[in-house]
């Protein structure tokens, strides 16, 4: 934590999506959140008022775009516009979770690429830089015409699992789907562990029971994904691993959306512990009993300071948390 950061031109504002994380980030930087109010009229319109001068300042907005996605996105766009009109020197968006990132290509004919549309909206509103965490696909960075820094969560999870002695050849890092192999490989390298994949075949459009590519018999397995929404992907993969002789199953995901029904799905799954970051705020009633939350605040706070002080970001891509 930096105490009383000595630069009055650095200003941090938070909207409604994840104020607890914003407060932690501000504390790690050594400053307080700026004062603003967000109102919603009876017809759903959003109004934002900045309650202090930010003229000539470098402003950082902390806002995830999780559910309600469209409300949180509109809050962000409106505040960007307000800051620009109030003569902020730069408007830097800290987006711990990028909603719509999964719509990054046309999977079917006549589908939109909404991740690109959102990028256009943020830039057009007046954002001058974006800092985000574990994009669904790193190619989304290319949708922007402004600098984008995409931090990774695997070093955070690796640090935690090292503390739990979940390292070495007896540990298998498992991707629950083909598209997540790169993320799983990254964690396996941090933990000196082996790699496996849970795959599924489709016959006549019907998804078949999953099978394992790799050896998990008698091993402790860690499932890795970026987004934990309904929990079904991890739950199904955990069942496949146990059927194939896994000793224990753990899971981690960068963003814990935990939509309705996820708690029951995960508590009924053969998963000993599920780790997520606090990139998305979730209420206690949606958190399964097996949940473990690892804060990304220090990582994002350090990135914010490096941006503000024009320091390189590269050391953060293999961050070793303090106390390692």
UniProtKB/Swiss-Prot annotation:
Key word Kinase present: yes
Subcellular location: Cytoplasm
EC number(s) stated in the UniProt entry for this protein: 2.7.6.1
Keyword Ribonucleoprotein recorded: no
Key words, A-Z: ATP-binding, Cytoplasm, Kinase, Magnesium, Metal-binding, Nucleotide biosynthesis, Nucleotide-binding, Transferase
Molecular functions per Gene Ontology: ATP binding; kinase activity; magnesium ion binding; ribose phosphate diphosphokinase activity
Cofactor entry: Mg(2+)
One Pfam family from the record: Pribosyl_synth
InterPro entries: PRib_PP_synth_CS, Pribosyltran_N, PRibTrfase_dom, PRTase-like, Rib-P_diPkinase, Rib-P_diPkinase_bac
GO cellular component, one term: ribose phosphate diphosphokinase complex
Family matches, as PROSITE patterns: PRPP_SYNTHASE
GO BP annotations, alphabetical order: 5-phosphoribose 1-diphosphate biosynthetic process; purine nucleotide biosynthetic process; ribonucleoside monophosphate biosynthetic process
Alphabetized CDD domains for the sequence: PRTases_typeI
Binding-site positions, D-ribose 5-phosphate: 225, 229-233
Comment on bound cofactor: Binds 1 Mg(2+) ion per subunit.
Subunit record text: Homohexamer.
Role this protein plays: Involved in the biosynthesis of the central metabolite phospho-alpha-D-ribosyl-1-pyrophosphate (PRPP) via the transfer of pyrophosphoryl group from ATP to 1-hydroxyl of ribose-5-phosphate (Rib-5-P).
Family: Belongs to the ribose-phosphate pyrophosphokinase family. Class I subfamily.
Protein's name according to its UniProt entry: Putative ribose-phosphate pyrophosphokinase 1
Organism this protein belongs to: Enterococcus faecalis (strain ATCC 700802 / V583)
Gene (name only): prs1
């Amino acid at each position: 934590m930096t105490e009383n950061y000595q630069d009055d031109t650095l200003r941090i504002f938070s909207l409604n999506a994840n104020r607890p994380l914003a407060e932690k980030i501000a504390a790690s930087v050594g400053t307080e959140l700026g004062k603003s109010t967000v109102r919603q009229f009876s017809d759903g319109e959003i109004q934002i008022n900045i309650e202090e001068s930010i003229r000539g300042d470098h402003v950082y907005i902390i806002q995830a775009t999780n559910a309600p996605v469209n409300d949180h996105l509109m809050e962000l766009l409106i505040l960007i516009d307000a800051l620009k009109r109030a003569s902020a020197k730069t408007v830097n968006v800290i987006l711990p979770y990028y909603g719509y990132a999964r719509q990054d290509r046309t999977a079917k004919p006549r589908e939109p690429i909404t991740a690109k549309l959102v990028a256009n909206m943020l830039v057009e509103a007046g954002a001058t830089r974006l800092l985000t965490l574990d994009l669904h696909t790193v190619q989304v960075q290319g949708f922007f015409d402004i600098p984008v820094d995409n931090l990774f969560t695997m070093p955070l999870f690796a640090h935690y699992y090292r503390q739990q002695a979940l390292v070495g050849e007896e540990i298998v890092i498992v991707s629950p789907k083909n598209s997540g192999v790169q993320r799983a490989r990254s964690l396996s390298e941090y933990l000196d562990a082996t790699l496996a994949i849970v795959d599924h075949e489709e016959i006549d459009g019907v998804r078949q029971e999953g099978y394992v590519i790799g050896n998990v018999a008698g091993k402790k397995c860690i499932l890795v994904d970026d987004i934990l929404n309904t929990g079904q992907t991890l739950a199904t993969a955990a069942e496949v691993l146990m059927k194939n002789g896994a000793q224990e199953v753990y899971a981690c995901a960068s963003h814990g959306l935990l939509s309705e029904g996820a708690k029951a799905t995960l508590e009924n799954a053969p998963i000993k512990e599920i780790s997520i970051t606090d990139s998305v705020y979730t209420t206690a009633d949606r958190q399964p009993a097996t949940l473990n939350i690892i804060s990304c605040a220090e990582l994002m706070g350090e990135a914010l300071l490096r941006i503000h002080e024009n320091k390189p970001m590269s050391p953060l891509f293999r961050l070793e948390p303090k106390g390692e």
